[in-house]
C-alpha cells in the first residue's frame, strides 16, 4: 500500500508531500500504479527544484526520492506561495485519482498541522 500525505505547516510556511510504501499491484518494474505515484513525486520534485533555481523559495528544498519513500518539502517566498501550493495540489489530485480507482493499493491521508 502506498500512503500519500500532503500538508502545510503555517508556522514556517512549508508545504510537504510524502509517499511511503509500495502498491504491490504487479511485480517490481511492472507496477503501473506504483509508477504513476512515483511520476507524480518526481514531477513535484522537479518543479520545486526549478522554483528554487529561480529564487522562488526561501531555502533549498528537501527532496528525497528513494524506493518506497519520497519526501518533498518546499518553503516558498510569500509572493510565490500560490504557485508552490498549486504544484503540490496538482500532484494531490493525481494521487486522489489513484486512491479512488485503486483503494487497495493507494491511500491519501489528509493532515492538518
Task: Outline where the language-model segments fall.
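N-terminal intrinsically disordered, cationic/polar leader segments
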Residues: 1-32, 42, 46-113
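Short, conserved glycine- and acidic-residue-centered signature motifs
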Residues: 33-37
Amino acid at each position: 500500500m502506498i500512503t500519500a500525505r500532503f500538508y502545510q505547516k503555517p508556522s514556517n510556511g512549508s508545504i510537504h508531500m510524502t509517499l511511503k510504501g509500495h502498491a504491490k499491484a504487479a511485480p517490481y518494474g511492472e507496477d503501473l500504479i506504483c509508477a504513476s505515484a512515483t511520476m507524480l513525486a518526481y514531477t513535484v520534485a522537479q518543479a520545486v527544484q526549478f522554483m528554487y533555481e529561480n529564487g522562488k523559495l526561501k531555502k533549498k528544498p528537501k527532496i528525497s526520492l528513494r524506493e518506497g519513500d519520497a519526501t518533498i518539502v518546499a518553503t516558498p517566498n510569500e509572493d510565490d506561495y500560490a504557485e508552490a501550493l498549486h504544484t503540490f495540489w496538482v500532484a494531490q489530485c493525481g494521487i486522489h485519482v489513484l486512491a479512488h480507482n485503486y483503494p487497495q493499493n493507494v491511500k491519501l491521508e489528509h493532515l492538518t498541522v
